[in-house]
């Protein structure tokens, strides 16, 4: 079964026929076929330009053709032989395997994600693998990727055989050769390789066809000479260096060799991700999209795995340099245009302060760590005991016990013992977190199950212990993370473990862990956090009078929203929140409410809330906080119910009241939709542009709506980090930045300079509160909260006016 022009010189090989192929008498029918037609049209390939054949025309299950490692069975080998014979008769110029099976048949390699987009010469024709349009092709980025690969195939559709680009790579040069190569080089790409905990080599490329790789694995006197030559070049501010994820190289050069990069830096990964945030951003991917260099990244691991020699590893480094140079030549004009240049240069400006954060780290109190572990173990034991009592009560069986870590036991309990209809995932019963959230909620047929909530809490604490409390620290007992400047599409940082496997994601440090992250001796920690940043920004973006009114009156937005949604007096909301705190036990919450007297109103809480709906498992203010965090971003009632643990009917009522009180939000959403449709992207109020790919449906609109405030919030904190790092003020020089976490920055300040602390905090506050202008022309700022203390987990709230006095009191109390 085939499709298209049999005489075409471009042949597409699909893995299997479309599901409706025999019904419709077409190999590319149905939804997948329609998708392929769209991709071909986007690539400029007409029906007459291509011929489609099938690698597996009888639709044999893939498992009967090849195993998971790509080894063909006898049936698979026969199919591969048939395909090759058919292609030899067709005499194509280019063949495009569109899937894992067809890729394996032609290239004897099943690793499609590594090979796609590369060109290979095979038996008289060229082979360019791509992804399967019948499966992954329904994902918008994948459609663009397949289209790009087909465009490449169209360009290569000539009789001439494919020849990989010639590369002149000088490896292990003498010092005088290195000096001559770099002497007249003002603009180079650069890449390092680390092996055995040391920088093994540094590669440079000053054009698209050549590279020079400096081998640093040599006797110390020679190594010192090579380091001096490389350092002089990289530390020269008149030079320009292009890298791929070059913050990694900068961090390693400083951490391992105290080599500072002062040259002007460009980064292909950052450039690509700013322009196309939905695509992958590895050098492998960028090479396949922007160059004609075939896949080579395996070569980097050959020597480390005992394959090949050191020369092959050096040669691999040179290929990285040439690939990076070529990618930059394709990207630079667009990313340095007015459309993207501001956010690109701002992102690159973060490199130096982030390298400092990665190098400095945060002091760890190992004794406190052991105490935190012990407290968590005791908490798990206590919660587990509570769970056993609850399941005995719920099941009316005094001998009932359950292992919260056993999905089988949990399913038997909920769906067997209690006889509840099972929640399913992929058609099978499940007790995952979403299912437990549903079980914890009340329905018209039953009360919410506290046992489900306890199991959630136990699993969360168990994960906390295994994921966060058993992490590795560096030898100097400091907590470090590896920061990623474009870790998210909004411009927010992300982070993870260091190259050595120590540390963890600094963005998700739980409160329990912060207790043992402490100030250095004779220092005090300061955390400055944006106050309800995204909510405030959204208020001005939407120009909603209700939200702006809450901000200008200075009322806590979470309490104000709770009052609007429930009708409960503000004083009662504040009193109840103070009494309940973060308690989630519905019985305990009910008891607290029944006994609570709101002193400012001289009335029982129950009387003041008569007729109002109350969330079972959280305080009224916490419910308002959940509304503020979710409903601005178009969350529906069902998802809101899962997020809050409230009943769906309650969530529908809360959502309706929220959107009635803040009535400009739905209008703003539609304005955002119109903007995305007209420009295929958005520019936020800090002049940062983001492109959006695909159909402008509700899913994309939710992403776009969330992007606008989140990107502005990230921009404020990141720009403050840059400004404060480079500040010439003596007070700022004394203050050290230790972490950048979402909407906050953590500092430490020497206690022997507390007289200057208030001034430092004032400068930092000014940096963190730039004046913004809404689309309606209204100027506004997002306020900053401040906390200080000796442990990140035990900070004291203060004000910028009182921070000096508070610091002195803390210091005196500690003495």
Question: At which residue positions do the language-model features occur?
Answer:
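Conserved "right-hand" nucleotidyltransferase catalytic core of DNA-directed polymerases
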Residues: 155-218, 252, 261, 278, ...
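Conserved RNase H-like, two-metal-ion catalytic cores of nucleic-acid enzymes
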Residues: 14, 20-21, 25-32, 36-37, ...
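Metal-dependent catalytic core segments for phosphate chemistry
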Residues: 195-218, 534-578, 582, 687, ...
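A generic structural motif
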Residues: 743-749
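A polyanion-binding, active-site-adjacent surface
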Residues: 1-160
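Conserved catalytic core of nucleic-acid polymerases
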Residues: 352-359, 476, 480-481, 485-488, ...
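Acidic beta-strand-to-loop metal/phosphate-binding motif
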Residues: 93-99, 238-249, 525-527
């Amino acid at each position: 079964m085939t499709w298209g022009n049999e005489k075409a010189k471009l042949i597409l090989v699909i893995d299997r026929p479309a599901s409706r192929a025999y019904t419709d008498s077409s190999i590319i029918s149905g939804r997948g076929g329609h998708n392929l037609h769209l991709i071909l049209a986007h690539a400029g390939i007409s029906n007459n330009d291509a011929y489609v054949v099938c690698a597996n025309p009888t639709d044999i299950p893939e498992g009967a053709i090849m195993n998971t490692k790509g080894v063909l069975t006898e049936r698979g080998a026969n199919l591969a032989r048939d395909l090759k014979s058919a292609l030899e008769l067709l005499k194509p110029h280019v063949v495009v395997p569109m899937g894992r099976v067809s890729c394996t048949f032609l290239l004897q390699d099943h690793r499609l994600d590594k090979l796609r987009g590369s060109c290979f010469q095979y038996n008289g024709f060229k082979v360019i693998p791509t992804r399967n349009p019948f499966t992954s092709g329904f994902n918008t980025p994948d459609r663009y990727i397949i289209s790009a690969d087909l465009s490449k195939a169209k360009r290569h559709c000539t009789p001439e055989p494919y020849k990989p680009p010639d590369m002149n790579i000088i490896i292990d040069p003498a010092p005088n050769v290195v000096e001559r190569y770099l002497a007249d080089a003002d603009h180079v790409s650069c890449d390092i390789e680390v092996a055995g905990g040391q920088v093994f080599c540094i590669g440079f490329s000053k054009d698209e066809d050549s590279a020079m790789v400096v081998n640093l694995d040599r006797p110390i006197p020679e190594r010192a000479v090579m380091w001096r030559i490389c350092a002089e070049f990289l530390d020269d501010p008149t030079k320009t260096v292009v890298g791929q994820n070059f913050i990694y190289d900068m961090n390693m050069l400083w951490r391992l060799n105290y080599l500072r990069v002062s040259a002007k830096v460009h980064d292909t990964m950052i450039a690509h991700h700013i322009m196309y945030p939905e695509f992958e951003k590895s050098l492998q991917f960028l090479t396949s999209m922007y160059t004609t260099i075939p896949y080579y990244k395996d070569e980097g691991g050959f020597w480390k795995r005992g394959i090949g020699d050191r020369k092959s590893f050096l040669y691999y480094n040179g290929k990285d340099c040439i690939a990076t140079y070529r990618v930059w030549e394709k990207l630079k004009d667009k990313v340095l245009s007015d459309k993207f240049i501001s956010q690109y240069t701002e992102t690159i400006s973060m490199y130096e302060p982030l390298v400092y954060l990665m190098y400095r780290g945060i002091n760890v109190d190992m004794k406190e760590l052991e105490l935190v572990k012990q407290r968590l173990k005791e908490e798990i034991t206590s919660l587990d005991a509570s769970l056993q009592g609850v399941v005995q009560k719920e099941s009316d069986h005094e001998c009932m016990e359950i292992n919260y870590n056993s999905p089988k036991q949990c399913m038997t309990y909920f769906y067997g013992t209690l006889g509840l209809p099972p929640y399913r995932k992929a058609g099978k019963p499940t007790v995952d977190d979403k299912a437990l959230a549903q079980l914890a909620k009340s329905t018209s047929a039953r009360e919410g199950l506290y046992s489900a909530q306890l199991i959630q809490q136990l699993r969360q604490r168990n994960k906390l212990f295994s994921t966060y409390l058993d992490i590795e620290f560096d030898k100097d007992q400091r907590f470090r993370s590896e920061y990623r400047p474009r870790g998210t599409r909004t411009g927010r940082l992300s982070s993870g473990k260091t190259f050595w496997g120590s540390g963890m994601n600094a963005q998700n440090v739980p409160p329990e862990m912060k207790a043992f992250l402490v100030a250095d001796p004779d220092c005090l920690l300061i955390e400055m956090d944006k106050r309800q940043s995204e909510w405030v920004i959204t208020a001005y973006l939407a120009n909603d009078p209700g939200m702006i009114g809450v901000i200008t009156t200075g009322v806590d937005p979470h309490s104000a929203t709770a009052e609007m949604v429930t009708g409960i007096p503000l004083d009662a909301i504040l009193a109840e929140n103070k009494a309940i705190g973060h308690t989630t036990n519905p019985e305990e919450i009910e008891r607290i409410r029944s006994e609570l007297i709101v002193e400012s109103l001289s009335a029982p809480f129950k009387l003041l809330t008569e007729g109002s709906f109350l969330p079972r498992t959280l305080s009224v203010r916490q419910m308002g906080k959940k509304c503020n965090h979710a409903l601005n971003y178009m969350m529906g009632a069902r998802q809101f119910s899962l997020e809050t643990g409230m009943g769906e009917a309650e969530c529908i009522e809360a959502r309706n009241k929220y959107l009635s009180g803040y009535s400009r939000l739905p209008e703003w959403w539609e304005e955002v939709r119109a903007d995305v449709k007209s420009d295929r992207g958005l520019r936020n109020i800090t002049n940062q542009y983001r492109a959006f790919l695909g159909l402008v449906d509700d899913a994309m609109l939710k992403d776009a709506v969330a992007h606008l405030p989140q990107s502005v919030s990230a921009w404020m904190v990141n720009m403050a980090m840059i400004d404060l790092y480079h500040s010439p003020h003596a007070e700022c020089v004394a203050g050290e930045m230790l972490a950048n976490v979402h909407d906050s920055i953590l500092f430490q300040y020497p206690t022997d300079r507390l007289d200057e602390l208030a001034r430092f905090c004032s400068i930092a506050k000014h940096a963190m509160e730039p004046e913004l202008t809404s689309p309606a022309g209204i100027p506004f700022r997002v306020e900053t909260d401040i906390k200080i203390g000796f442990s990140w987990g035990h900070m004291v709230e203060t004000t910028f006016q009182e921070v000096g006095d508070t610091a002195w009191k803390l210091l005196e109390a500690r003495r």
